């Protein structure tokens, strides 16, 4: 009985390790999909396909491309958000100034006793 239980435990542990290994291999395959085509062979040597070598440019593999871009330029979404906030803030300020000017001019016109200078209503009156 004990030997059957030991076998069952061993089988379960073997299945678990096999599943873990398969998961690791799948993760490695997914991680390897984004790797560059030209991989370093030795220090400074890169595989160049045969044929017309002048047209084929060997590109150095970029390791941790996204990390490099984020640290060199800053996070693009955050930068765009800051620029948009600055632009929107400036537009709101300009609109508020225009609104204040219009409100002020209307309130001054209503308060002032002088007739409006640009109102030529009398000139175009057709009544005799």
Swiss-Prot record:
Keywords: Cytoplasm, Developmental protein, Differentiation, Metal-binding, Neurogenesis, Nucleus, Phosphoprotein, Ubl conjugation, Zinc. Residues 117-121 are annotated as: His cluster. InterPro entries: BEX (IPR007623), TF_A-like/BEX (IPR021156). Signal peptide: none annotated. GO terms for cellular component: cytoplasm; nucleus; transcription regulator complex. The keyword Nucleotide-binding does not apply. Phosphorylated. Phosphorylation of Ser-105 protects it from the proteasome. The keyword Zinc applies. Residues 1-37, 107-128 are annotated as: Disordered. Pfam families: BEX. Zn(2+) binds at residue 125. Residues 115-128 have a biased composition (Basic and acidic residues). GO terms for biological process: cell differentiation; negative regulation of protein ubiquitination; nervous system development; positive regulation of transcription by RNA polymerase II; signal transduction. One of its GO terms (molecular function) is signaling adaptor activity. Its main location: nucleus. Coiled coil: none annotated. It is found in: Nucleus; Cytoplasm. Disulfide bonds: none annotated. The modification Phosphoserine is found at residue 105. Signaling adapter molecule involved in p75NTR/NGFR signaling. Plays a role in cell cycle progression and neuronal differentiation. Inhibits neuronal differentiation in response to nerve growth factor (NGF). May act as a link between the cell cycle and neurotrophic factor signaling, possibly by functioning as an upstream modulator of receptor signaling, coordinating biological responses to external signals with internal cellular states. The histidine cluster (His cluster) and Cys-125 mediate zinc-binding. PANTHER family: PROTEIN BEX1, PROTEIN BEX1-RELATED. Interacts with neurotrophin receptor p75NTR/NGFR. Interacts with OMP. This is Protein BEX1. It comes from Macaca fascicularis. The lineage of its organism: Eukaryota, Metazoa, Chordata, Craniata, Vertebrata.
